[in-house]
Amino acid sequence: MSKPYVVGIDIGGTNTVFGIVDARGSILATGSIKTQKYTEITDYVNALHEELSRLLAQENVTDQIAGIGIGAPNGNYFNGTIEFAPNLPWKGVIPLAQMVREKFNIPVTITNDANAAAIGEMTYGVARGVKDFIMITLGTGVGSGIVINGQMVYGHDGFAGELGHVIVRRGNGRLCGCGRTGCLEAYTSATGVARTAREFLELRNDESTLRQLPIQEITSKDVYDAAVSGDKLSQEIFEYTGTILGEAFADFIAFSSPKMIVLFGGLAKSGELIMRPIREAMEKNLLAIYKGKVKLVLSELKESDAAVLGASALGWEAS
């Protein structure tokens, strides 16, 4: 009988979360360690091995794991590496899949976190059975995973699909964390929304409840709360953000003709505040042959579970 469980590991800049998952996408148990606590990769892998082994033993499934999937910033599917991830404590190229495989003697697959989210959506979520879609994660950054004909698009080197870093404002665009200017992420991530709020408040005289807050401490949640309460400036910030996203989505559709675009992450939970301007700008800018054909949908995976589920879906692939 094939082994009934896989392990999903989601590596974030602050925490690493892992879980034991069955083929239906039910999470048996989860655990975590502090990513930032370990400045040496060997110490990190040792801690991960210790905590995950404890969880497997606790659930009495140590010998029932088919594979391990890892989602990580700048994870390279082809090489099994994390490469030059700016928000992780280990620099350069880290052969993480090999290191974890040697600890557990179980097949290991790694990819970037947005690709893992797309695979999770395709395996357990709203994109199940959909062969062509784009996953967009709207959080601190903007990530993406592209699926064409049922296959993740990795490109020749494993780094295809960095749609958060397409240029949407040329010339005098905002500086992005990647070092370039004008990237989609600089405008439409949670930090981008907060930055738009600061710019609007500094450049305009509109009344806004946001003016009651220290300007440098304003967050995207502050903007959302104000918008829901009827603050016109905050609503305009969402309009601005959604329009940029919708225009970008129209371009994305032109090169892959997806059946749907799936949105996930904190900003996506803003509902129609963000969905309406995205939808309107996307349809307005679509080539005629694509109009009315592409669904814009929200992920159905629980945010607390999605990262582990996405990574776990890779575990079945590894097995």
Tell me what each language-model feature is.
Residues 128-187:
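Glycine-rich phosphate-binding loop of actin/hexokinase-like ATP-binding domains
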Residues 118:
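Acidic/histidine-rich catalytic cores of soluble enzymes
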Residues 72, 78, 148-149:
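A cytosolic small-molecule/anion-sensing beta-strand core signal
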Residues 81-92:
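A charged helix-plus-loop insertion that forms the helical arch/lid used to bind
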Residues 27, 82, 152-153:
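Hydrophobic "anchor" residues
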Residues 31-33, 86, 156:
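Short hydrophobic alpha-helix segments
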Residues 1-67, 77-79, 98-108, 123-130, ...:
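ATP-binding/phosphotransfer module of carbohydrate and carboxylate kinases, centering on a glycine-rich
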Residues 110-114:
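Short loop/edge segments at beta-strand edges and connector loops
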